[in-house]
Amino acid sequence: GKIATGDLFVGDSATKAAIEAKCAPDCVEMEGAAVSQIAAKNGVPCVILRAMSDNADEDGHEVLVVKKFSIGEYVATATKIVAAMVEAL
């Protein structure tokens, strides 16, 4: 899917709506494009794997702080995803 990237945390509905109107992304994030750009500039292969942690709205900061999750479940899911990516290569 399409990912928008930028240099600020999207923490309100107005900013979210503006981004959606501009490029209709499936999600937004802050670091992936920068990492990919530097890797490409230096000839280093790069894959970005992200976990979405909030809804990019007024409750975004709260979700990051109060959401409980099982680290075991996270690791198991991430392992399956990465293994499938490696097999596809």
List PLM regions with ranges.
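Glycine-rich phosphate- or other oxyanion-binding loops that anchor nucleotides, phosphorylated ligands
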Residues: 1-89
